[in-house]
């Protein structure tokens, strides 16, 4: 059905099972190299991602992007770089998520520059630095960090979306841009949050 959609063809968004590994979940936002996958498991991981992308392409004609995500095995800039270096750039693209990239220790504008040719799908997600620092001090796990607003509404955090949008436009990017906003129980109305985020995007000319 997805392959039959007219207009801009959708993507299959692939991610690992976020929030299942206790160490990764507990230390989201402060992952160290020692918490990463061993080389042998990286090989299996990358091969699995490539196999999914290849099968999807062959059977449906759709392309696949990988969504890096805090609380999973591909969180930090180094881990994203490793997966990208181990997979075919013609086969597997990157779903670049600004909030997860920042919480994972990266600079979103720098990441956009680095992977601009590999980014086929883009997630608008803001980052609250105060909540991020408190997460580190208090030792919050991934879900506690989200509940405490580490991924705030657009325009309420530190990410420079105007600069990111300008860079996307300069590069000729014409793919999807999706707002991924976490609104857990007790965090307000998802509908009102979506409305405010839409107004913010309009302020950027989108």
How should each PLM-predicted stretch be described?
Residues 1-94:
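Active-site acidic/histidine proton-transfer and metal-coordination neighborhood
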Residues 50-54, 77-96, 102-206:
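Histidine-acidic metal/acid-base catalytic patches
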Residues 70-71, 99-101:
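Short, flexible loop segments at the rims of nucleotide/cofactor-binding pockets, characterized by
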